[in-house]
Amino acid sequence: MATKHEQILTYIDSLPVGEKISVRRIAKEMKVSEGTAYRAIKEAENKGFVSTIERVGTIRIEQKKKENIEKLTYAEVVNVIDGQVLGGRAGLHKTLNKFVIGAMELDAMMRYTAAGNLLIVGNRINAHRQALEAGAAVLVTGGFNTDDSIVQLADELELPILSTSYDTFTVAAMINRAIYDQLIKKEIVLVEDILTPADRTVYLSPKDKLEKWYEKNFETGHGRFPVVDDQMKIHGILTSKDIAGHDRNASIEKVMTKNPVTVIGKTSVASAAQMMVWEGIEVLPVTDGHQKLIGMISRQDVLKALQMIQKQPQVGEKLDDIVSRGFKDEGDDKEDQTVYEYEVTPQMTNQLGTISYGVFTTILTQAANRFLRSKKRGELVIESITIFFLKPVQMESVIEVKPRILEAGRKFGKMEVEVHSQGHIVSKAMLMVQLMERS
């Protein structure tokens, strides 16, 4: 039996796109307390089912597919620009294809404006009307308003007409930044991108006998199976270690590992990797946040995803990407120690003209990561780092980074990284890392 919380989420999901939602209405229709309704609406917002807009309320929106994440809805634009909705509220859930800045004569402006666009313009009433008639939404900058006839037309066509106090350039920059941030989010590989879905996952029931494990093991060749009830709620996990020494007629419920470590679909692959190393487990059940099984991931899935992340072309550039671009592999020095060369650019410095601590830490960790991969030791997750800053590093100076493995086990390792500039040692770091060896 689904909980009240899950029933409300299912109800919200079934509502048509553009429908207005309120705590009081949900509580009344679902016969629950307002607190329960509020919590469910908040979770729906986190999942992308609904969006809350100031002075408008909460509306049901279309959940974006990951491949279309670079496109924004008008509802998101309102939040990005701190704007207000003058008319056309029913169209806030629609997606904008591109935005057009109306800094030209009206006839020329309309040549660039098409359905699904957002026209950014000042207090030009004729431009507002023609844009709406062309199927485009309108964003009025400078805090200006529009005519009542335009608001009425926007309501009829279900095309939003928005207003913001910012100027045109600032608004365009803010929307551009929002799209760019979403492109970066697109690159972050999540567990939901690599999981084996529940309908393709082999699972057992707590009521089954251990004999069932042997049957599934023979059929699939796998040795680890999630244990779920009729509602797909996860109760445990059964592995070959659990069944050792037990009779085949014993109940799975008595033998299985209860309360297994689980992740949700929105967990990053990097977090899942760290969890698997720390707990020493080979598979992780993936749930919907309420212990309902939606799939499984294995250590092999995670390693493959981490390798894919390193090879894929970057769309939105992150700070780590900018730093890693400057590395040059200088081979080995006289003592057969691997050396990486790096030039400090002006963007990497602080107000004193020396290298920023954040950038410096990134250089050290990336050098350690590159070195481990070159030694075929797999991926690393840093547990702790101690840095000794001995001398300041000036802008445009070239530094030599020398990583070295002090000790490496199957799961953990210790590393030392020395940094030299102009023949002098400028920094030394000690790293404790978790290792995830390639199988």
From Swiss-Prot:
Disulfide bonds: none annotated. The keyword Repeat applies. CDD domains: CBS_pair_DRTGG_assoc, hot_dog. Keywords: CBS domain, Repeat. Residues 195-254, 256-314 form the CBS domain. InterPro entries: CBS_dom, CBS_dom_sf, Diverse_CBS-Domain, DRTGG, HotDog_dom_sf, Ser_kin/Pase_Hpr-like_N_sf, Thioestr_dom, WH-like_DNA-bd_sf. This is Uncharacterized protein YtoI. It comes from Bacillus subtilis (strain 168). The gene is ytoI.
